[in-house]
Amino acid sequence: MIRRRKKVRKLRGSHTHGWGCKKKHRGGGSKGGRGMAGTGKRNKSKWTWTIKYAPDHLGKRGFSRPPEVQREVRTVTLKSIDENLDELLQKGIAYEEEGKIIVDTTQFADKVLGTGKITKPLVIKARAFSSKAEEKIKAAGGEAVLV
């Protein structure tokens, strides 16, 4: 039967527990720092590692706009207006006046985009129009009114 003392027990009373000089087995200082320490701009002690494995570690990238400045532009396409015209008439968003159908998009959108076609001459009221949308509305015999 083999009887072997544990290393910890053997080294009781030893200053360094087998690590040589006292300062050799201290904290992060003997290991080049902890984690990403030393990867910064100053002494570049881990510069080659930074360049190879973390090239984006330094430097600024973009910015985030403050929430009070951000504003989502709600859009609607000509295609969706044309397809849902009956529904818009029922809800009262669109109405007929002097033989023309007037669609007031300000209730549900900020800008009208020119995707799709218009089959009827419509008068569309909106806060903004894309250039293509204006062209298509006029080509169909309608009118684009800025509110």
Curated annotation (Swiss-Prot):
Binds to the 23S rRNA. PANTHER family: 60S RIBOSOMAL PROTEIN L27A, LARGE RIBOSOMAL SUBUNIT PROTEIN UL15. Belongs to the universal ribosomal protein uL15 family. It comes from the Archaea. Coiled coil: none annotated. Part of the 50S ribosomal subunit. This is Large ribosomal subunit protein uL15. Pfam families: Ribosomal_L27A. One of its GO terms (cellular component) is cytosolic large ribosomal subunit. The gene is rpl15. One of its GO terms (biological process) is translation. Gene3D superfamilies: 3.100.10.10, 4.10.990.10. Residues 1-43 are annotated as: Disordered. InterPro entries: Rbsml_uL15_N (IPR027386), Ribosomal_uL15 (IPR030878), Ribosomal_uL15/eL18 (IPR021131), Ribosomal_uL15/eL18_sf (IPR036227), Ribosomal_uL15_CS (IPR001196). GO terms for molecular function: rRNA binding; structural constituent of ribosome. Keywords: Ribonucleoprotein, Ribosomal protein, RNA-binding, rRNA-binding. Residues 1-28 have a biased composition (Basic residues). It comes from Pyrococcus abyssi (strain GE5 / Orsay). Residues 29-38 have a biased composition (Gly residues). PROSITE patterns: RIBOSOMAL_L15.
